[in-house]
Each structure stands twice: as C-alpha cells, then as structure tokens.
Amino acid sequence: QDGKPIVCLSSTTDDGRSRIKPLLEAGDGVGIARSDVHYVITEYGIAYLFGKSIRERALALIEVAHPRWREELLKAAQKLGYVRADQYLASQAAYSVHDERIVTLKNGTKVMMRPARASDAGALQGLFHRLSEDDIYTRFFRRVRSLSYPDLQTLCNVNHETEVAFLAVTGPRENEEIVGSACYFLSPTTNLAEVAFMVAPEFQGAGLGTALQTRLQEYAMSRNVRGFVFEILPRNTSMLRLAARAQGTITTSRDDDVVHVTALFANSGSASRSPLPESQDPQAGEVAA
C-alpha cells in the first residue's frame, strides 16, 4: 500500500550496450507501465519520472545512463522530438550525492543544497516567476518577463568545473521545490569566479543566501579557485551585505552604476578585509538574500 514503483538496473548490459533506450524494441519485456514508474536508479544516479513532462523524463534518464551512451541517447531523443534540438550535455560525470548538504535556516526550515542538473530547467523557471520585478532587475540588470530555455540551461546544465551551480530545495525528492539558486562562472585567465544568486521571496531574510554562498565557497576552495567576483547594483543592499560576508580579503570599487566586489579566499593570499563604504556595512541590517 502506498508503495512507489522503482526500477533498479545497471546502466549497461554485459556486452556494454545501454540499458537506457530511446524506444522499446520488438520483443522487449515490459513488467510495469512506463507512466507508472516513479524512480529509475543506476550506478550513475536516480531519475525521478512520475508526473514529469516528456522532456524532463528524457533528460533525467539520459543523466543516469552510462556516459559513453549519453550523446547517442540525446541525439535519438532530439530526433524523436522528446527534447529540444539545442539541448546539450555540459557534463558526463555522474550526479554527485556527496555534494548534497542539509542546512537548517534561521526560521528552522531544513533545506537541501544539491548540484543542479540539466533536467532542473523547468523548476528553475518556476523559481524565476516567483521573484519580484525588483528581484529580477537586480539579478539580471534588465527587465525580464521569462527566462529563455538557453538562459535556464546556463543556470543548471553546467560542467561542475568552470561552471558550477547549486540549488536549494525543499520537500520530498519526488516533489521538491526549488527555493534558491547559486552559480559561478570561472575565468581561466584570473582564476576568479563571477557569482550570482536567486532566492525565493518567502526565504529572503532567512539566511538562505548566506548558506548558498558558504556552500559555493566550500566547493570553489576545494578546487583551488582564487576567489569570487560580484557585480552588484548599488541599490541591491541585500547582495552587498551578502558579498561582504564572503571569506577572505574583500575589496570594492564602483564603475558607473555597478559596484564591483572581489573576495580573495584565505588560501589565495591575505585574509584581511578592506572596509566597505558606510552604506554597504554588512552589519547595517539583516541579509534579505
């Protein structure tokens, strides 16, 4: 009673062929209707399928297929119209369960922070549409009504090396809700990463932005990233306070209508802080991010 159908299988057969297929072949046995399956589990991760769109199901299954077969499966899915023609796979690595973290926010809510996946695009759009117009403007520096699919993929379909993205989610895995997003994009010339955040309105002021930044820093420092770079509108005081809480040496400058904040991590040099202008004092109020 109340059980959930779960399919567990190795990603390949004994002779190396993919067990994840774009279509069932003649003679393939079916033990359960495909529409009823909740989870498919391989050694490369867990795909949750129940209630998802065809695009989301196809991407989730490709993500848990053997890396050797993913490009072929993606091309087949594109040919069948299951996914967009411009869909790509930024990473061939398995989803890293070891990079998941559970944190308790100031309001007592428990939130999981996990690596983003290509199949998260639809849920990220949902987070975007919950943001206020001002949140959107201070995040993207322009008025945006909706994120294009390529924009969404930039925020979740990453290689986890020079492009990194973490999501904050609540609820059970089969019905999780994205309440926050943090990502960075590394410059190979400076070894500094530009960072960006989105936090759902109901979680602003609860410390989620700080928790996401801490997780992003932990990941970056483990990969010898030199530091973070923030590009912030002066009126975005919440983000200025969040940047001031970054680890290491903090320096700021202003160019036209943008405040540039650089945080050099302690393992890349001095760990002292240069003072921010009074209006950017991190103790001036609570962090809304």
Please annotate each region the language model reported.
Residues 1-88:
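Conserved phosphate- and dinucleotide-binding cores of soluble alpha/beta proteins
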Residues 83-99:
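Intrinsic disorder at enzyme termini
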Residues 94-289:
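Long, contiguous binding/interaction regions
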